[in-house]
Structures are given as structure tokens and as C-alpha cells.
Amino acid sequence: MLRVAVPNKGSLSEAASAMLSEAGYRQRRDSRELVMVDPDNDIEFFFLRPRDIAVYVGRGTLDVGITGRDLLLDAEVEAEELLPLGFAASTFRFAGPVGDFASAEELEGKRLATSYDGLLRGYLAERGINAKVVRLDGAVESSVRLGVADAIADVVETGNTLKAAGMEIFGDPILKSEAVLIRRAGGTTNGTAKEVDVLIRRLQGVLVARQYVLMDYDIRKELVEKAAALTPGLESPTVSPLRDSDWVAVRSMVPKKETNRIMDELYDLGARAILVSSIHACRI
């Protein structure tokens, strides 16, 4: 049975469970449940703190897990990323008092507060920057005002909290993070490789289904090539004959975010009966 770690709370939890549900896996109905078995798919889910998931997977206690890329790197364990999942995006950045710093190199000899000391130490070591890392469990924005640190390194989404604390972002991003599927480095060791492959394919199918729609339309034969240039699909659009031999029906997958633009251009080209359908699931 495949053993999978899922975040039990926070911004990762709801989105991870929704994605697994879309992939056809049973998910818990009570947020107090810590373990749930899906017998139909021969899989067992363990709901854990997001920060602990990389540790369990890295030690081989669990086969795979969903966590943040930032949490994976911060854990400094023998686990590797299998698949980016497209949600919980964030950026790990340096911030300091307005006007005090312009680049990471200026942090030499300074005190840096963070909740991600493993990730930060690795970044500083790669660049040969000697700075004192001060680990805090949260509210690192207050550390500079309280005299604990000269600057901070933290996950930034909007930057509003930093501005309220009289701070600004500086330097290049330390890391661009999102939710990821991870496994122990070197692969699973308990004969679950096939089940992991199925899980990856299903999650990839959800990602594609979220990013694309199916577009159907009718168009005159002589305009098919021009229409196909607008809707090339993943390999090629499907073209089917109609009762009126001068016309054909075309079906193609198109990026969801470009749907209305493509519909407008097809209509201007001469296409009619343009319809769009959602994709529930797919295998590409």
C-alpha cells in the first residue's frame, strides 16, 4: 500500500486535498482525522504538519508527500522533488529597513532572522556570505525593530506586512516556491514505484485539465489551416466531416486563459457554433 503525506493545515492543506480528490482519491471529511485509507486505490494518507512532511519522506517512513519547495529545502533531508503542483506559490526574499541594503552581498557580518534557517544557511554558503542566522518560529518582521536582527529572510506574498513594519525587499529572490510532490532521494524502496507513477500521472492529468479547455467549432474547409494555426492542440486538432461537405467540425485543446481571445479570432475568421467545454480529467 502506498503511504502518502498530506498537509494537515495551512494554505497547503485545502488545495492539496482538492487536487487529490480531483485525481480520484478519497479524502478525509473531518479535519481531525490524522490517517485515512482509500482501499479502492490501495493508498493510505497521513495528515501531518507541512514542515514535518519532508522529514518523514526523507527518512523513508512514508513513500511520497506534498509540501512546499521551501519546506523541502529547509528540512535538509534526503528527499527530492517529483512534480510541481501549481498552487501555494510564494517567494523567499531578503528584507530590511528602508534604504539600509541593496544586495545580499551587503549582509556580510550581519544578523539575519528567519524561520527557514536550513534554506538560508545553504543560500549564504553557496555565495560565500558570512552572516549570523537567527532562527525564529514566526513574526520575523518584528526582529529588526526589537534589535534581534539587522535584516530578515522570509516568505513574501504581497509585501504588505513588511511595509507596515517599515521594511523593504532587496536583492534577488532567494527561492521561488510552490507546492511539490516529493519522495525519498533515489526512489522508493518498498515496491511502490508503480503506484507512485500512477499518482504522478493522475496529478499531471489534473494540472492539464485545470490549464486547458476543449474547444469545438465549425468552419469552411478552405479555412481549416488558418483555424488550426489558432487552435493547434497538443499534437493536432481533430477535424471531422459534416453533412455539408463544404464545412468541417474541429475539436482542439486550448489554454484556458486564452479562451476568449481565440474564440474572437475564430469568429472573425469565419468559424461558427464555437463551444467550450471543461476538462474533468485527462492523460497526456
Swiss-Prot record:
Which reactions are catalysed by this chain? 1-(5-phospho-beta-D-ribosyl)-ATP + diphosphate = 5-phospho-alpha-D-ribose 1-diphosphate + ATP
The pathway it acts in is: Amino-acid biosynthesis; L-histidine biosynthesis; L-histidine from 5-phospho-alpha-D-ribose 1-diphosphate: step 1/9
Which GO BP terms sit in this record?
L-histidine biosynthetic process
> In the UniProt record, does the keyword RNA-binding occur?
no
Per the record, its GO cellular-component terms are: cytoplasm
The record ties this protein, via SUPFAM superfamilies, to:
GlnB-like, Periplasmic binding protein-like II
The record's section on Pfam families has: HisG, HisG_C
One term of GO molecular function:
ATP phosphoribosyltransferase activity
Where, subcellularly, is it found?
Cytoplasm
Keyword Metal-binding (UniProt): yes
What EC identifiers does the entry list?
2.4.2.17
- Entry's Gene3D superfamilies? 3.30.70.120, Periplasmic binding protein-like II (3.40.190.10)
Concerning InterPro entries, the annotation shows:
ATP-PRT_HisG_long (IPR020621), ATP_PRibTrfase_cat (IPR013820), ATP_PRibTrfase_CS (IPR018198), ATP_PRibTrfase_HisG (IPR001348), HisG_C (IPR013115), N-reg_PII-like_a/b (IPR011322), N-reg_PII/ATP_PRibTrfase_C (IPR015867)
Query: Which controlled-vocabulary keywords does the entry list?
Result: Amino-acid biosynthesis, ATP-binding, Cytoplasm, Glycosyltransferase, Histidine biosynthesis, Magnesium, Metal-binding, Nucleotide-binding, Transferase
Describe how its activity is regulated. Feedback inhibited by histidine.
Cofactor dependence is on:
Mg(2+)
Tell me its family. Answer: Belongs to the ATP phosphoribosyltransferase family. Long subfamily.
Q: What does this protein do?
A: Catalyzes the condensation of ATP and 5-phosphoribose 1-diphosphate to form N'-(5'-phosphoribosyl)-ATP (PR-ATP). Has a crucial role in the pathway because the rate of histidine biosynthesis seems to be controlled primarily by regulation of HisG enzymatic activity.
Name the record gives this protein: ATP phosphoribosyltransferase
Organism for this UniProt entry:
Pseudarthrobacter chlorophenolicus (strain ATCC 700700 / DSM 12829 / CIP 107037 / JCM 12360 / KCTC 9906 / NCIMB 13794 / A6) (Arthrobacter chlorophenolicus)
